């Protein structure tokens, strides 16, 4: 008993078996560590890349205007699909109604309606200028000989530009005979020079633009009462395929000229209108 008590009792005592709970816990911990060490590291799953739709820039106001302008029908495209039609008196009547509809009453519009008797036969696109004038004015030689009034002409031909006026004057050779022809446009010619020329000479035929003719009438350099024929260069088209009445500036000046006494002369049957 004494010997047993003398020994270091804690040294001789066998190591106590670990409790199942402790051993189990430690083994489980080792297993977990082993699994964590040996298990392959899962590859990082690629996050789905966000897909950004590229937004088309909204067209600016200028771009939209250009697009609309580009889509607008051109006169050349319209003419390519249809044959050109010669101008008629009704075309002029319609332009008169459209021009004055916003500024005149219904009664005033009726007064502006031109009688059919004031219209000469329109060009059917088969005539030259000389042949057309011979047809509508067969007594030109007689009229020319009896005309002796200054500051006036027997016939006016309205066109859209000075270049076109020169072309028409060159094509008058077969018709005019000994008649005196005057250029009535603004290019390189001052109004006062034309006024002085009309005061000095007897002119039978004038070819020019409505703007300059209107200015001569306004300055009392040209009287319209002796006028017998007013011919519109109606069917000719410029490089942009525009007729003279398709050009807003020219159309405006034509109506301003008509307001200077042409309507009343047509109704009195002393003035005839022709569409060449």
Swiss-Prot record:
| Low complexity composition-biased segments | 13-23
SUPFAM superfamilies found in the cross-reference section: P-loop containing nucleoside triphosphate hydrolases
Residue positions, PTM Phosphoserine: 19, 23
Q: List compositional bias (Acidic residues) regions by residue number.
A: 1-10
Q: Does the keyword Metal-binding apply?
A: no
- Which keywords, in A-to-Z order, does the entry hold? Methylation, Phosphoprotein
Region (Disordered) spans which residues?
Answer: 1-91
Q: Which InterPro entries match?
A: Cms1 (IPR032704), P-loop_NTPase (IPR027417)
Residues where Omega-N-methylarginine is found: 164
Q: Which domain of life is it from?
A: Eukaryota
Compositional bias of kind Polar residues = 32-56
Positions of modified residues (Phosphothreonine)? 209
In the record, the note on similarity to other proteins reads: Belongs to the CMS1 family.
Query: Can you say what this protein is called?
Result: Protein CMSS1
Q: Which organism is it from?
A: Mus musculus (Mouse)
Its lineage reads: Eukaryota, Metazoa, Chordata, Craniata, Vertebrata
């Amino acid at each position: 008993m004494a010997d047993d008590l003398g020994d270091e009792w804690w040294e001789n005592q066998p190591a106590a078996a670990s409790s199942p709970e402790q051993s189990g816990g430690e083994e489980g911990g080792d297993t977990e560590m082993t699994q964590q060490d040996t298990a392959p590291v899962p590859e990082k799953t690629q996050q789905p890349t966000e897909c950004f739709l590229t937004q088309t820039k909204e067209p600016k106001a200028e771009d939209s205007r250009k697009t609309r302008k580009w889509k607008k029908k051109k006169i050349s495209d319209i003419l390519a699909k249809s044959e050109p039609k010669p101008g008629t008196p009704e075309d002029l009547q319609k332009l008169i109604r459209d021009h004055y509809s916003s500024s005149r009453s219904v009664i005033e519009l009726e007064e502006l309606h031109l009688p059919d008797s004031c219209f000469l036969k329109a060009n059917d696109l088969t005539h030259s200028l000389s042949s057309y004038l011979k047809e509508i004015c067969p007594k030109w030689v007689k009229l020319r000989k009896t005309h002796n009034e200054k500051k006036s002409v027997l016939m006016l031909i309205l066109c859209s530009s000075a270049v076109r006026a020169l072309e028409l004057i060159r094509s008058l050779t077969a018709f005019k005979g000994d008649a005196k022809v005057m250029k009535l446009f603004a290019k390189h010619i001052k109004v006062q020079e034309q006024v002085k020329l009309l005061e000095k000479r007897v002119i039978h035929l004038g070819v020019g633009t409505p703007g300059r003719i209107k200015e001569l009438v306004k300055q009392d350099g040209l009287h319209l009462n002796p006028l017998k024929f007013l011919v519109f260069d109606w069917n000719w088209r410029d490089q942009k395929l525009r007729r003279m009445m398709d050009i807003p500036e020219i159309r405006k000046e034509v109506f301003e000229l008509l307001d200077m006494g042409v309507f009343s002369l047509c109704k009195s049957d002393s003035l005839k209108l022709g569409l060449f």
